Protein backbone atom coordinates (compact mmCIF):
# COMPACT_ATOMS: atom_id res chain seq x y z
CA UNK A 1 0.00 0.00 0.00
CA UNK A 2 1.43 3.43 -0.93
CA UNK A 3 2.04 6.05 1.73
CA UNK A 4 -0.42 8.50 0.12
CA UNK A 5 -3.25 8.38 -2.40
CA UNK A 6 -3.12 12.12 -3.12
CA UNK A 7 -4.04 13.12 -6.67
CA UNK A 8 -1.03 14.84 -8.23
CA UNK A 9 -1.01 17.46 -10.99
CA UNK A 10 1.61 19.07 -13.17
CA UNK A 11 1.45 22.53 -14.66
CA UNK A 12 3.38 24.77 -16.97
CA UNK A 13 4.38 28.39 -16.63
CA UNK A 14 2.06 31.33 -17.17
CA UNK A 15 2.16 32.30 -20.83
CA UNK A 16 0.77 35.17 -22.92
CA UNK A 17 -1.17 33.66 -25.86
CA UNK A 18 -0.95 35.92 -28.90
CA UNK A 19 -3.74 37.07 -31.18
CA UNK A 20 -2.95 36.26 -34.83
CA UNK A 21 -6.43 36.27 -36.39
CA UNK A 22 -7.31 39.97 -36.33
CA UNK A 23 -7.15 39.92 -40.15
CA UNK A 24 -9.12 36.69 -40.58
CA UNK A 25 -11.94 36.83 -43.14
CA UNK A 26 -14.49 34.37 -44.49
CA UNK A 27 -17.75 34.63 -46.44
CA UNK A 28 -16.97 38.27 -47.18
CA UNK A 29 -16.70 39.50 -43.58
CA UNK A 30 -14.27 39.63 -40.68
CA UNK A 31 -14.42 37.18 -37.78
CA UNK A 32 -14.97 37.25 -34.02
CA UNK A 33 -11.21 37.79 -33.71
CA UNK A 34 -11.59 41.34 -35.08
CA UNK A 35 -11.86 43.91 -32.26
CA UNK A 36 -14.80 45.79 -33.79
CA UNK A 37 -16.73 42.62 -34.64
CA UNK A 38 -16.16 41.33 -31.11
CA UNK A 39 -17.35 44.63 -29.63
CA UNK A 40 -20.44 44.65 -31.87
CA UNK A 41 -21.31 41.19 -30.52
CA UNK A 42 -20.92 42.32 -26.91
CA UNK A 43 -17.44 40.98 -26.11
CA UNK A 44 -14.89 43.01 -24.15
CA UNK A 45 -12.21 42.17 -26.68
CA UNK A 46 -11.39 39.90 -29.58
CA UNK A 47 -10.94 36.35 -28.24
CA UNK A 48 -7.80 34.37 -28.95
CA UNK A 49 -8.64 31.25 -30.95
CA UNK A 50 -9.12 28.17 -28.77
CA UNK A 51 -6.48 25.87 -30.34
CA UNK A 52 -3.84 28.47 -29.44
CA UNK A 53 -4.14 27.19 -25.86
CA UNK A 54 -3.44 23.60 -26.89
CA UNK A 55 0.29 24.29 -27.25
CA UNK A 56 0.60 24.90 -23.52
CA UNK A 57 -0.52 21.34 -22.83
CA UNK A 58 1.99 19.64 -25.13
CA UNK A 59 4.99 19.77 -22.73
CA UNK A 60 2.80 18.34 -19.96
CA UNK A 61 1.37 15.56 -22.11
CA UNK A 62 4.77 14.68 -23.56
CA UNK A 63 5.97 14.31 -19.95
CA UNK A 64 3.01 12.06 -19.09
CA UNK A 65 2.69 9.95 -22.24
CA UNK A 66 6.07 10.31 -23.97
CA UNK A 67 6.39 10.10 -27.76
CA UNK A 68 3.06 8.26 -27.92
CA UNK A 69 1.39 11.63 -27.34
CA UNK A 70 2.62 12.89 -30.71
CA UNK A 71 1.73 9.67 -32.50
CA UNK A 72 -1.76 8.89 -31.16
CA UNK A 73 -2.70 11.72 -28.80
CA UNK A 74 -6.23 13.14 -28.50
CA UNK A 75 -6.98 16.48 -26.88
CA UNK A 76 -10.66 17.14 -26.20
CA UNK A 77 -11.68 20.54 -24.85
CA UNK A 78 -14.74 22.41 -23.63
CA UNK A 79 -14.10 26.15 -23.61
CA UNK A 80 -15.34 28.09 -20.58
CA UNK A 81 -14.08 31.68 -20.84
CA UNK A 82 -12.37 33.57 -23.64
CA UNK A 83 -8.86 34.99 -23.40
CA UNK A 84 -7.84 38.31 -24.93
CA UNK A 85 -4.40 39.61 -25.87
CA UNK A 86 -2.35 40.48 -22.78
CA UNK A 87 -3.93 37.97 -20.40
CA UNK A 88 -1.84 35.18 -18.89
CA UNK A 89 -2.82 31.51 -19.00
CA UNK A 90 -1.44 28.41 -17.27
CA UNK A 91 -2.12 24.80 -18.33
CA UNK A 92 -2.63 21.91 -15.90
CA UNK A 93 -2.80 18.13 -16.26
CA UNK A 94 -3.52 15.45 -13.69
CA UNK A 95 -0.91 12.72 -13.37
CA UNK A 96 -2.76 9.52 -14.28
CA UNK A 97 -2.25 6.18 -12.58
CA UNK A 98 0.46 3.96 -14.00
CA UNK A 99 -0.69 2.45 -17.30
CA UNK A 100 -3.70 4.78 -17.68
CA UNK A 101 -4.22 6.21 -21.17
CA UNK A 102 -6.37 9.24 -20.31
CA UNK A 103 -6.10 12.19 -17.96
CA UNK A 104 -7.89 15.43 -17.08
CA UNK A 105 -6.63 18.77 -18.37
CA UNK A 106 -7.62 22.36 -17.65
CA UNK A 107 -6.33 25.92 -18.03
CA UNK A 108 -6.74 29.03 -15.90
CA UNK A 109 -5.99 32.73 -16.10
CA UNK A 110 -3.74 34.26 -13.43
CA UNK A 111 -6.79 35.34 -11.39
CA UNK A 112 -8.10 31.77 -11.37
CA UNK A 113 -10.74 32.24 -14.08
CA UNK A 114 -11.18 28.90 -15.88
CA UNK A 115 -10.36 28.97 -19.59
CA UNK A 116 -11.12 25.38 -20.59
CA UNK A 117 -11.56 21.88 -19.24
CA UNK A 118 -11.15 18.56 -20.98
CA UNK A 119 -9.29 15.31 -21.42
CA UNK A 120 -6.12 14.11 -23.08
CA UNK A 121 -5.55 10.50 -24.07
CA UNK A 122 -3.44 8.23 -26.24
CA UNK A 123 -4.55 5.47 -28.58
CA UNK A 124 -5.12 3.26 -30.29
CA UNK A 125 -8.04 2.49 -27.98
CA UNK A 126 -9.01 5.89 -26.63
CA UNK A 127 -11.27 6.01 -23.57
CA UNK A 128 -14.32 8.29 -23.75
CA UNK A 129 -13.14 11.87 -24.24
CA UNK A 130 -14.56 15.11 -22.89
CA UNK A 131 -16.58 15.58 -26.07
CA UNK A 132 -17.72 11.96 -26.16
CA UNK A 133 -19.24 12.43 -22.72
CA UNK A 134 -20.81 15.77 -23.64
CA UNK A 135 -22.28 14.48 -26.90
CA UNK A 136 -23.86 11.57 -25.05
CA UNK A 137 -25.89 14.07 -23.01
CA UNK A 138 -27.16 16.08 -25.98
CA UNK A 139 -30.69 15.93 -27.32
CA UNK A 140 -31.20 16.12 -31.10
CA UNK A 141 -31.87 19.64 -32.34
CA UNK A 142 -35.48 20.15 -33.39
CA UNK A 143 -34.71 22.78 -36.01
CA UNK A 144 -31.29 23.43 -37.52
CA UNK A 145 -30.70 26.85 -39.07
CA UNK A 146 -27.08 27.52 -40.03
CA UNK A 147 -26.39 23.81 -40.62
CA UNK A 148 -29.80 22.90 -42.03
CA UNK A 149 -28.32 21.82 -45.40
CA UNK A 150 -25.80 19.42 -43.83
CA UNK A 151 -26.23 15.94 -42.41
CA UNK A 152 -24.15 13.49 -40.40
CA UNK A 153 -21.85 11.44 -42.62
CA UNK A 154 -22.03 13.85 -45.54
CA UNK A 155 -18.98 13.70 -47.82
CA UNK A 156 -17.20 16.53 -49.56
CA UNK A 157 -17.19 16.99 -53.33
CA UNK A 158 -13.54 15.99 -53.74
CA UNK A 159 -10.77 14.29 -51.80
CA UNK A 160 -8.76 17.10 -50.21
CA UNK A 161 -4.97 17.17 -50.07
CA UNK A 162 -3.18 19.79 -47.99
CA UNK A 163 0.42 20.53 -47.04
CA UNK A 164 2.08 23.10 -44.78
CA UNK A 165 5.59 24.44 -45.24
CA UNK A 166 7.41 27.00 -43.10
CA UNK A 167 6.80 30.06 -45.30
CA UNK A 168 3.36 29.31 -46.77
CA UNK A 169 0.60 31.79 -45.94
CA UNK A 170 -2.36 29.65 -44.91
CA UNK A 171 -5.01 31.81 -46.58
CA UNK A 172 -7.83 34.13 -45.53
CA UNK A 173 -8.92 31.90 -42.64
CA UNK A 174 -5.42 31.80 -41.19
CA UNK A 175 -3.45 34.70 -42.70
CA UNK A 176 0.00 33.76 -41.43
CA UNK A 177 2.73 31.18 -42.03
CA UNK A 178 4.07 28.43 -39.80
CA UNK A 179 7.25 30.44 -39.22
CA UNK A 180 5.18 33.44 -38.13
CA UNK A 181 3.28 31.20 -35.71
CA UNK A 182 6.52 29.74 -34.33
CA UNK A 183 7.72 33.29 -33.56
CA UNK A 184 4.72 33.76 -31.23
CA UNK A 185 3.79 30.24 -30.06
CA UNK A 186 3.51 29.84 -26.28
CA UNK A 187 5.62 26.66 -26.13
CA UNK A 188 8.28 26.37 -28.83
CA UNK A 189 9.90 23.00 -29.41
CA UNK A 190 13.02 22.55 -31.55
CA UNK A 191 11.12 19.67 -33.14
CA UNK A 192 8.86 22.27 -34.81
CA UNK A 193 11.67 24.22 -36.49
CA UNK A 194 13.50 24.01 -39.80
CA UNK A 195 16.84 24.32 -38.00
CA UNK A 196 16.37 21.50 -35.50
CA UNK A 197 13.39 19.47 -36.74
CA UNK A 198 15.67 16.58 -37.69
CA UNK A 199 16.38 16.10 -33.97
CA UNK A 200 12.81 14.84 -33.41
CA UNK A 201 12.34 11.10 -32.84
CA UNK A 202 10.93 10.91 -36.38
CA UNK A 203 13.87 12.69 -38.00
CA UNK A 204 11.71 15.51 -39.39
CA UNK A 205 10.08 18.74 -38.25
CA UNK A 206 6.56 18.14 -36.94
CA UNK A 207 3.53 20.44 -37.20
CA UNK A 208 2.50 21.89 -33.81
CA UNK A 209 -0.78 20.67 -32.34
CA UNK A 210 -2.43 24.08 -32.56
CA UNK A 211 -1.64 24.28 -36.28
CA UNK A 212 -3.49 21.08 -37.18
CA UNK A 213 -6.84 22.88 -37.33
CA UNK A 214 -5.16 25.41 -39.63
CA UNK A 215 -4.01 22.61 -41.94
CA UNK A 216 -7.40 20.89 -42.04
CA UNK A 217 -9.17 24.17 -42.89
CA UNK A 218 -6.75 25.11 -45.67
CA UNK A 219 -8.71 23.23 -48.34
CA UNK A 220 -12.11 23.21 -46.63
CA UNK A 221 -13.74 25.27 -49.40
CA UNK A 222 -13.16 22.38 -51.80
CA UNK A 223 -15.64 20.21 -49.88
CA UNK A 224 -18.54 22.36 -51.06
CA UNK A 225 -20.44 22.15 -47.78
CA UNK A 226 -23.25 24.71 -47.77
CA UNK A 227 -24.18 26.68 -44.68
CA UNK A 228 -26.59 29.55 -44.22
CA UNK A 229 -25.05 32.92 -43.53
CA UNK A 230 -23.70 35.36 -42.88
CA UNK A 231 -22.66 33.77 -39.59
CA UNK A 232 -19.84 34.51 -37.15
CA UNK A 233 -18.29 31.39 -35.68
CA UNK A 234 -16.99 30.84 -32.15
CA UNK A 235 -15.61 27.54 -30.85
CA UNK A 236 -17.46 26.07 -27.86
CA UNK A 237 -15.81 22.64 -27.97
CA UNK A 238 -12.98 21.15 -29.97
CA UNK A 239 -11.22 17.81 -30.30
CA UNK A 240 -8.11 16.84 -32.25
CA UNK A 241 -7.10 13.19 -32.47
CA UNK A 242 -3.94 11.82 -34.05
CA UNK A 243 -4.36 8.47 -35.80
CA UNK A 244 -0.92 7.87 -37.31
CA UNK A 245 0.97 10.92 -36.15
CA UNK A 246 2.74 13.14 -36.04
CA UNK A 247 2.10 15.25 -39.13
CA UNK A 248 5.23 16.60 -40.78
CA UNK A 249 6.10 19.95 -42.30
CA UNK A 250 6.28 19.80 -46.11
CA UNK A 251 4.28 16.57 -46.36
Model-derived regions, located:
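Short beta-strand edge segments in extracellular beta-sheet folds
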Residues: 121-125
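Hydrophobic beta-sheet segments that form the core/acyl-binding groove
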Residues: 69-119, 238-251
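Hot-dog-fold acyl-thioester-processing enzymes
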Residues: 2-72, 127-239, 245
